[in-house]
């Protein structure tokens, strides 16, 4: 068990004052009263603190305390760790955070879960306990505090300091094109297809998923702050090349297509847009199969989550996603590569040459080598269906 001597506690009101101080650029002590809170505040007043969200990825994505970093401690990590995790395992994509922890540059780390009221209530095998143990071994000079009541209490008392996933604002219906416009926006006299209704959906603050119709609506793109588009098709036009950055991945939506050979290139493109503080719309024709596959691969790679978890996360935002069976097979292979090689990859350099599309690399030259089968046994699709339904999809209507 994590004892009181090993883990200090912090009241939600203290964290709120600390966040106020940081937002106001303030130095000096924020003051504080109450058992345990005053001592924790004294620890944090002299430098920057780190917030670690110890909840699952889906919970963190639905809502989190602003500025927090989500740790990775899923079932795969726990099974491999056998009760002892490293910073590379719980913070695989946060190289700078790991370096700052090891250098003692954080005055304190505040960990929180969903609702743990006290340190003594933590289970020995809980994520918080495993994270605290990793911090004790790798960041000995850093003090650690548990946020009392966790995210549930803090978000209830101070929602203004939390970020939550919210529905996109309603986007006005399309304006009929003028006689000088030749864009085919995909509308018919019988109404807008299901996959074109509404607007693009936010997967992450910098990553959106939609259809070719959405990519042809400049009003939608501007309203969302889109700066770049990733066109996952061989036939969808790039309508506004003078206004947005474009990248094309010419993949067909059929069981012979090798979309996995594009995963790393797509992930690097999305990251490049994010690093420039931009936003990217990933689209194909319908925003159902090819572009959804790219978004799933991105989540699996960057968030180190399993396909099932990534699929649920994306489907909550765009219910009609349905990668074809071959793409699902390639994603499962990708999951295996990401999760089974992550221990070695987490300690390796994030850069390295990509394997040539369509060719296997016999000798590893980078942290990941993807050599996926491009033919997965499937039954022929009925001629009236434009895509194959995912085996995870519960019904064709989804």
Swiss-Prot record:
Per its record, what are the GO molecular function terms? Answer: MAP kinase serine/threonine phosphatase activity; MAP kinase tyrosine/serine/threonine phosphatase activity; phosphatase activity; protein tyrosine phosphatase activity; protein tyrosine/threonine phosphatase activity
- Sorted UniProt keywords: Acetylation, Hydrolase, Nucleus, Phosphoprotein, Protein phosphatase
- For this entry, list what GO says about its biological process: dephosphorylation; negative regulation of ERK1 and ERK2 cascade
Instruction: One GO cellular component term, please give it.
Output: nucleus
Give a yes or no for keyword Protease in this entry.
no
- The active site lies at 284
Residue ranges of every copy of the Rhodanese domain listed in the record:
45-163
Keyword Phosphoprotein carried by entry: yes
Q: Which Pfam family, any one, appears in the UniProt record?
A: DSPc
Q: What is its EC number?
A: 3.1.3.16, 3.1.3.48
What post-translational events are described? Answer: Phosphorylation in the C-terminus by ERK1/2 inhibits proteasomal degradation and stabilizes the protein.
Q: Which family does it belong to?
A: Belongs to the protein-tyrosine phosphatase family. Non-receptor class dual specificity subfamily.
Q: How does it assemble?
A: Hollow spherical complex composed of 24 subunits with pseudooctahedral symmetry, has a tetramer as the basic unit.
Name assigned to this protein: Dual specificity protein phosphatase 4
Instruction: Give the organism, scientific name.
Output: Mus musculus (Mouse)
Q: Which gene encodes it?
A: Dusp4
